[in-house]
Amino acid sequence: MKETYKVNIDEVPAQPDLGPDQGWVGMTVQFVIDAFNGGSEHLVFGRARFAPGQSEHQWHRHENAEEFAYITKGEGIVLDGDNEIPVKAGDVAFHQKGAWHGFRNTSATEEAEMIWGWAGAASKATAGYELRYPAHGEDHSH
């Protein structure tokens, strides 16, 4: 029998293995619901917090998953193709499968926060995550 999975988002630990070498700079990321938490097969639901200053999720894409990002706190810019799109609390951005994108907190004093999700994949590995400019030419798609 399949059961409902319930969790309090504030009780979900941040991912300890996501850092600058994979494009996650000055930020914490929670995978609230995914293949490992809740047994999802086609969806990831998460929260990201970006420290004031130079925090960002660098240019990346996921060939197997669409993504939405709902800005719940602060402001920043969404990196999209050759564009930098200003966003603030209340804005939602959507990225199609395979589209290069990222996010940068533009405030020197305020944290930015987003609720984000992937549709079409239930983990970073199955999403086909790829960093645009990998550190030292390494492949970070796994």
Over which residues does each language-model region extend?
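Short beta-strand His + acidic residue motifs that chelate non-heme Fe in jelly-roll/DSBH
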Residues: H57-W59, V78-L79, H95, H101-A108, ...
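Short, conserved beta-strand element in jelly-roll/cupin
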Residues: R47-A51, R61-V78, G117
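Short strand-connecting beta-turns/loops that link adjacent beta-strands
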Residues: N37-G38, N64, A108-E110
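Short acidic-glycine-tyrosine-enriched beta hairpin
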Residues: D82-K97
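A short, N-terminal "cap"/entry segment at the start of jelly-roll beta-barrel domains
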Residues: M1-L43, Q58, G128-H142
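A short hydrophobic beta-strand segment most commonly corresponding to one strand
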Residues: F45-A48, F94, T109-T126
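Short, charged/polar surface micro-motifs in flexible loops or helix N-caps
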Residues: N37-E41, F50-E56, E75, A122
